[in-house]
Amino acid sequence: MRILGIDPGLRVTGFGIIDVSGHRLAYVASGVIRTPTADLATRLGTIFQGVSTIVREHAPDQSAIEKVFVNVNPQSTLLLGQARGAAICGLVAGGLPVAEYTALQLKQAVVGYGRATKTQMQEMVTRLLNLSGQPGSDAADALGMAICHAHGGNTLSTLGGLAPALAKKGLRVRRGRLVG
């Protein structure tokens, strides 16, 4: 199975592609989509076209993208949400299912600690994929998103969807974990 991970951003959108066979992960490609210093519509179009091209060239089976977090600056949050929307449109236009994970879920799945630093993420991605060099932070986050989806991301999403049934049994999902 081939998974495309996306780390959305208005200026720089990271992408990472891995192949998964059982518990084995193999690096395929990674990089960034840089948008020009231009109006918002042009930047969003660049993200959409870039993601669409990656989907066409690498033919992933599934995709995973980071959920928007609420920033201190509401305007920044809105802009990030629009960039994310453009990326999702590129994924959906390519016929891909889209899984969504929070930054906390991503870091927990890849590093084992939800408050991991960018450097820790880069190091773990490098080790997990046996890379010869360390990817940039945006590409590393995108590769991490693909790894998260491959290794338990599905479980985290499923647990979140089961929340109402779990609550009836006195259980809940907290930070991606089942707790009593």
Swiss-Prot record:
Protein's cellular compartments: Cytoplasm
SUPFAM superfamilies: Ribonuclease H-like
The protein's name in its UniProt record: Crossover junction endodeoxyribonuclease RuvC
Chain sites annotated for binding Mg(2+) 2: E66
Keyword presence, Hydrolase: yes
InterPro entries xref list: RNaseH-like_sf, RNaseH_sf, X-over_junc_endoDNase_Mg_BS, X-over_junc_endoDNase_RuvC
Protein's organism: Burkholderia lata (strain ATCC 17760 / DSM 23089 / LMG 22485 / NCIMB 9086 / R18194 / 383)
One Gene Ontology MF term: magnesium ion binding
EC number: 3.1.21.10
Co-factor note (free text): Binds 2 Mg(2+) ion per subunit.
